[in-house]
Amino acid sequence: MHELALTAELLRLLENNAREKGIKHIKRVKLVIGALSSVLPEAVEFSFNTLKEGPLFEDAKLEIEEKPVRIRCRDCMAEKAVDHFYPLCPSCGSGRVSIIEGKEFYIDFYEGE
């Protein structure tokens, strides 16, 4: 479960950034997780709620935006959201597709005081 290690690092980054900015309490954290990132949102949420400690994260809420897989065909230039990555364009059947969304894993923002 690599989500535990990822979440521990995420909390460390948030703590360091909050300290630099003089923030004493983080209220809300928004993450973006892509469907192809190999990161399970439920495991990150569990890890966040398990690992957050101290006054900085006391009331912190985690919001996760899940990004679907989007591909672009390099032949017909179609852009499509797909349920699962399949290396063929759903419009023309070409195998020349690029993933343009779905690999993300980042902190979008956090709110604190």
UniProtKB/Swiss-Prot annotation:
TM segment ranges: none
Binding residue positions for Ni(2+): H2
Pfam family of the protein (one): HypA
A single MF term (Gene Ontology): nickel cation binding
Binding site for Zn(2+): C73, C76, C89, C92
Alphabetically ordered keywords of this record: Metal-binding, Nickel, Zinc
GO terms classed as biological process: protein maturation; protein modification process
HAMAP family cross-referenced by the UniProt entry: HypA_HybF
Role of this protein: Involved in the maturation of [NiFe] hydrogenases. Required for nickel insertion into the metal center of the hydrogenase.
Family membership noted in the UniProt record: Belongs to the HypA/HybF family.
Name of the protein this chain belongs to: Hydrogenase maturation factor HypA
Gene: hypA
